[in-house]
């Protein structure tokens, strides 16, 4: 689900400190919001903010040095028409950047049309980068997934599986081996662009890991600051299964890498059988190292198949 609400007032307060901007016009339109249809169709935050452009309506329009020069570089009548056309774009907010001064006609237009206009000394490029990152996250498709989300050897790994298989205990073992916890039990996932899923912990559960028989553990307090992560990009799903499930539902050596769809993005997946005596933490780290190789374009299974093919051709040639 993608949220579709952010008001001009909320946007102003969010970046009042970082962008040091002032509200210079349209003060009565604090509840002005992004168009819901545009938000729903937007593929990323880049679609919702940019330099002044008359063919891209309904987005935050940024007015830097060149844009202000364009608005004032014609005859008085043409300048009025250029400024008046901004109303037809129905921007949720206008942002005056590069320490520019708004023409009186632009301020008057914003007051009449009740379009909020903010002014900042920051560069237009910087403002666009900041707002795109914020809007991409705010309007991202999102879901919640059950499991333990970790940073293992620098890779974002989600550990999933049936209840009672020891996911949290495995997470604790991996933390003791120097890896980091992002979230336990409930993981918030966001699609921040077309190919990237980012996961973080709900605020209520931050730094906490529940282990049966012990209870809640504050990982940050026990292991230190380096044992927790604020967020990670999801690159691998490790799914724990019982022996009978593995034999029934999965191939021993799948010809193609397994993937799982998360918010429309295919994520690499490995399945590990849980039985007494197996060191699951070592297996998970090995799976992560193998995934890192795959992401670099090195596929051990395909290399084995090719090696086997060459051996057969060599034998047939004798």
From Swiss-Prot:
GO terms for biological process: regulation of carbohydrate metabolic process. GO terms for molecular function: ATP binding; magnesium ion binding; phosphorelay sensor kinase activity; protein serine/threonine kinase activity; protein serine/threonine/tyrosine kinase activity. Its cofactor is Mg(2+). Keywords: ATP-binding, Kinase, Magnesium, Metal-binding, Multifunctional enzyme, Nucleotide-binding, Serine/threonine-protein kinase, Transferase. It catalyses: [HPr protein]-L-serine + ATP = [HPr protein]-O-phospho-L-serine + ADP + H(+); [HPr protein]-O-phospho-L-serine + phosphate + H(+) = [HPr protein]-L-serine + diphosphate. The active site is at residues 146, 167, 185, 252. Mg(2+) binds at residues 168, 210. Homohexamer. Catalyzes the ATP- as well as the pyrophosphate-dependent phosphorylation of a specific serine residue in HPr, a phosphocarrier protein of the phosphoenolpyruvate-dependent sugar phosphotransferase system (PTS). HprK/P also catalyzes the pyrophosphate-producing, inorganic phosphate-dependent dephosphorylation (phosphorolysis) of seryl-phosphorylated HPr (P-Ser-HPr). This is HPr kinase/phosphorylase. The gene is hprK.
């Amino acid at each position: 689900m993608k949220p579709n609400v952010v008001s001009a007032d909320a946007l102003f307060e969010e970046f009042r400190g970082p962008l040091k901007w002032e509200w210079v016009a349209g003060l009565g339109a604090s509840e002005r919001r992004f168009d819901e249809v545009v938000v729903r169709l937007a593929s990323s935050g880049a679609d919702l903010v940019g330099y002044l452009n008359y063919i891209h309506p309904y987005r935050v329009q940024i007015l830097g040095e060149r844009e202000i020069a364009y608005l004032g570089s014609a005859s008085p009548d043409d300048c009025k028409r250029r400024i008046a056309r901004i109303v037809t774009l129905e921007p949720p907010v206008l942002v005056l950047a590069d320490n520019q001064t708004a023409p009186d006609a632009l301020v008057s237009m914003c007051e009449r049309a009740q379009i909020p206009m903010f002014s900042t000394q920051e560069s237009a490029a910087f403002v666009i980068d900041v707002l795109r990152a914020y809007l991409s996250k705010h309007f991202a498709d999102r879901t919640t997934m059950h499991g333990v989300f970790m940073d293992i050897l620098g890779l974002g790994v989600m550990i999933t599986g049936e209840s009672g298989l020891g996911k949290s205990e495995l997470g604790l073992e991996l933390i003791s081996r120097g890896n980091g916890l992002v979230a336990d039990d409930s993981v918030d996932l966001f699609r921040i662009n077309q190919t990237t899923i980012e996961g973080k912990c709900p605020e209520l559960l931050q730094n906490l890991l529940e282990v049966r028989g012990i209870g809640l553990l504050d990982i940050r307090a026990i292991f230190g600051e380096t044992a927790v992560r604020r967020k990670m990009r999801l690159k691998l799903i490790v799914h724990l299964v019982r022996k009978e499930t593995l034999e029934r539902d999965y191939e021993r050596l799948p010809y193609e890498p397994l993937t799982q769809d998360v918010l429309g993005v295919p994520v690499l997946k490995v399945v590990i059988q849980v039985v007494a005596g197996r060191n699951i933490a070592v297996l998970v780290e090995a799976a992560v190292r193998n995934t890192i190789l795959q992401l670099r374009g090195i596929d051990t299974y395909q290399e084995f198949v090719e090696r086997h093919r060459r051996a057969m051709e060599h034998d047939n040639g004798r």
